[in-house]
Amino acid sequence: MKRKNIALPVVFCCLFLFSLQGEAELNLADEQLAKLEQKYDERAGKRFRAWRELIQKSQSLPEEDKLKEVNNFFNMAVLFVSDADNWGVEDYWATPFECLGKGIGDCEDFSIAKYFTLRELGVPDEKLRLTYVKALAPYNQAHMVCTYFPSPTSAPLVLDNLVGEIEPATNRSDLVPVYSFNGSGLWLAKARGTGQEVKGGTGRLAMWQSLKDRMGKDKI
């Protein structure tokens, strides 16, 4: 009996499936772009395209290079504006879609956009946290940063909209950590380390739940 070569059809099938997946992702990106420009303006569309280009070009980079690219992108693309001036409320956590759309945001919006972009780039959730801190003089106010743990026992690196350079938390004596969280849990931060995990996790953070609900609608 003549043996059939099934390898070639399998390869073609895989290529076809990959092409369908790529086409679906492009269609979704086009839908998001159209939605963004309709809701905001053409400048919002330019920011969205630049964000997609950032993701495409950074996929194969080492993790610490991804941190630099993402940190620099949002620190340059978004201007700081308080929630009171931006949304007319004391505190509001914008989705990346809203942040890119308006091109303005406060410290939470910078940090959230960086966190979800790094997740999109494949950085594991256990290495990332959104960290509430107290920023000391000259700011003397509550502040949020995105932090990255190279290893479970190392000091986290701080991605901050106030300081352009990414530095270890041990070098940021101007920041006093309060608590941190990600998609997996919530921690009290008594020191510049991992902190003590809180029972109930992020289910205790109503703002986080609201943010995720709105992100589901944005599909971003």
Language model region names:
Residues 9-17:
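Bacterial N-terminal signal peptides
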Residues 1-9:
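Bacterial N-terminal signal peptides that target proteins for export
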Residues 22-220:
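A structural boundary/capping signal
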Residues 5, 19-22:
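Intrinsic disorder/low-complexity detector
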